[in-house]
């Protein structure tokens, strides 16, 4: 009668850890996908906004040409143009922040893959031991049968 492998519980724990690590990779990859989509969206938004801003500045200057404005209104006009430039900086900062998020997510994916590799190695060690143990047990049983 075969006895049960004494490290079965440890093997179960190792297999569970390996599966958990694999799920961690899936979660990290999903986060990375989402971060990349967000980055592309931000970039497209920035480019569209820049195009609109250029057209808006041109439209504002065209409306200004040939008119007499008091200094106060000219100052307000210049402040409006400056606000557009500030808005561009804020949108560019959002793109940079999204790019940083992508880099962070890429690092998390790498770390998660490293955890899977480590967990797989640990599981493989126990599986190799179990295979050797099974062979030894089989040989002992064959010897016991041969003696009887």
Regions picked out by a protein language model, each given a short descriptive name:
Residues 1-148:
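Charge-rich amphipathic alpha-helical interaction elements
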């Amino acid at each position: 009668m075969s006895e049960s492998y004494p490290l079965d519980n440890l093997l179960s724990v190792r297999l569970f850890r390996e599966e958990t690590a694999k799920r961690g990779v899936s979660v990290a990859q999903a986060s990375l996908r989402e971060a990349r989509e967000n980055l592309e969206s931000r970039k497209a938004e920035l480019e569209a906004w820049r195009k609109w801003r250029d057209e808006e500045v041109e439209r504002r200057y065209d409306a200004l040409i040939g008119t007499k404005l008091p200094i106060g209104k000219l100052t307000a006009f210049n402040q409006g143009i400056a606000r557009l430039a500030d808005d561009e900086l804020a949108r560019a900062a959002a793109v940079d922040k999204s790019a940083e998020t992508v880099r962070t997510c890429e690092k998390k994916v790498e770390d998660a893959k490293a955890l899977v590799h480590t967990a797989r190695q640990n599981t493989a060690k126990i599986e190799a031991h179990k295979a050797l143990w099974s062979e030894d047990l089989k040989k002992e049983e064959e010897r016991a049968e041969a003696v009887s």
